[in-house]
Amino acid sequence: MAAPVRLGRKRPLPACPNPLFVRWLTEWRDEATRSRRRTRFVFQKALRSLRRYPLPLRSGKEAKILQHFGDGLCRMLDERLQRHRTSGGDHAPDSPSGENSPAPQGRLAEVQDSSMPVPAQPKAGGSGSYWPARHSGARVILLVLYREHLNPNGHHFLTKEELLQRCAQKSPRVAPGSARPWPALRSLLHRNLVLRTHQPARYSLTPEGLELAQKLAESEGLSLLNVGIGPKEPPGEETAVPGAASAELASEAGVQQQPLELRPGEYRVLLCVDIGETRGGGHRPELLRELQRLHVTHTVRKLHVGDFVWVAQETNPRDPANPGELVLDHIVERKRLDDLCSSIIDGRFREQKFRLKRCGLERRVYLVEEHGSVHNLSLPESTLLQAVTNTQVIDGFFVKRTADIKESAAYLALLTRGLQRLYQGHTLRSRPWGTPGNPESGAMTSPNPLCSLLTFSDFNAGAIKNKAQSVREVFARQLMQVRGVSGEKAAALVDRYSTPASLLAAYDACATPKEQETLLSTIKCGRLQRNLGPALSRTLSQLYCSYGPLT
């Protein structure tokens, strides 16, 4: 008789380790689906992530280690768990028993952004999800602004130059190359910890930033006395700020620790031609030949904005391979009529003007070059003429029209020689990115006037088109794709609603569709502070509130 087959004991499948959390998330998802709220997607993603987690969770705060669990959702779970325990339910959240109660309505809007990844876990004693590292520029900025906030004689804000100087005073010896590329100041602005107002920019702490800065000061053992209540602290009570953090802040602002200064006779003015103007077919190589024929000192390099700029290049640099260069306050964008026509059709026209106005150079020239017959273009001549007129009257550009490429080269040669005479005898000094220049300061009071200019590296790096963008920047670009939304209108919209989630939450809070259509109509836009208007507000509400396909 054959021996009986011995079968191993079958391992039972584990029960759901967090049934209460699963039940509550399911309830909230179903309720959001019934009310047609977009938070249903947040709950669904969190529910899927929770079901894959094999271990029990004791609180909603512990669920933050899972994907798609943000501060708002974890707080909702903790509040629901507390209500469950108060009503006599099991104390363990993984108990199968629970209480069926509707989700708190006041918290649904808080999880609009809960699917965003948490950048850092808080340390002991900290609240919230963001806690800047000890050797980070963000920590330095918060502490410096906190000192200014505590100063009874201060303005409770700092300009960018003042902010850089305060950080440099805390660590005057910065090792070259020790800066990291993470833009600390921009990160704090996006986290709504630092507020930027006015022009030139002023930086101050928001209520959330003030709370975090106070906890940072307490964590470092700083009291009200040694945090400093004045702009100048005693030497023995200064807080040590890491050198790398100060260098990181300087790198983010696009400045050098030692400003570049070029005295008369130590530099030459030359024309920089974008490499895109020299490649390709047609008449592009002819431009360089014309410049050479006119004996214009020029160089060809990659420009991220504009087609022509002028730089003051150091003549006797310490490093011949890397001479110091300062960008003069003039930039030229060249457009042939056929290129102007195509750029208007595909939207590049508005975007290029918007980027030119933000490049840091104040004297902008729009060079329009005739090319062939106007009747062969895709747009009528009146449309092109109106676009050029708007560029001059509304955008404030200087518009120059030329007959052909030879006349364009002659105009560039004339500008080059004019700038060489204009800056002759001037002392040039670099300035931080984002601060206004003063090319005419001291022209009447000093035989050697001082001009503050951007370095070429800062100018070109600040104009990169495809650099990493925040949600706010992407949202602004998305709004500008809507017909009628200019750069100024998009800026006004993102000042009120910085993310799509905040705009959708505002739409969800409206009682009627009519209220949704007029939600944005009273937002002030532009220098004249005119209303956005009901027509554009209705268009945007249809775009963001329609669940079906747009018609």
Curated annotation (Swiss-Prot):
GO terms for biological process: DNA catabolic process; DNA repair; double-strand break repair; double-strand break repair via break-induced replication; mitotic intra-S DNA damage checkpoint signaling; osteoblast proliferation; replication fork processing; resolution of meiotic recombination intermediates. Changing residue 348 to E: Reduced 3 prime flap and nHJ cleavage and loss of 5 prime flap cleavage. The modification Phosphoserine is found at residues 95, 101. SMART domains: ERCC4 (SM00891). Residues 84-130 are annotated as: Disordered. Induction: Up-regulated in cells treated with agents that damage DNA or block replication. This up-regulation seems to be independent of transcription. Residues 270-372 form the ERCC4 domain. Mg(2+) 2 binds at residues 277, 307, 333-334. Mg(2+) 1 binds at residues 274, 277, 307, 333. Residues 471-545 are annotated as: Helix-hairpin-helix (2HhH). Changing residue 191 to E: Reduced 5 prime flap and nHJ cleavages but only mild effect on the cleavage of 3 prime flap. Its cofactor is Mg(2+). Its EC number is 3.1.22.-. Residues 84-93 have a biased composition (Basic and acidic residues). GO terms for molecular function: 3'-flap endonuclease activity; crossover junction DNA endonuclease activity; DNA binding; double-stranded DNA endonuclease activity; endonuclease activity; metal ion binding. CDD domains: WH_MUS81, XPF_nuclease_Mus81. GO terms for cellular component: endodeoxyribonuclease complex; Holliday junction resolvase complex; nuclear replication fork; nucleolus; nucleoplasm; nucleus; replication fork. Coiled coil: none annotated. It is found in: Nucleus, Nucleolus. Changing residue 274 to A: Loss of endonuclease activity. Belongs to the XPF family. Catalytic subunit of two functionally distinct, structure-specific, heterodimeric DNA endonucleases MUS81-EME1 and MUS81-EME2 that are involved in the maintenance of genome stability. Both endonucleases have essentially the same substrate specificity though MUS81-EME2 is more active than its MUS81-EME1 counterpart. Both cleave 3'-flaps and nicked Holliday junctions, and exhibit limited endonuclease activity with 5' flaps and nicked double-stranded DNAs. MUS81-EME2 which is active during the replication of DNA is more specifically involved in replication fork processing. This is Structure-specific endonuclease subunit MUS81. It comes from Homo sapiens.
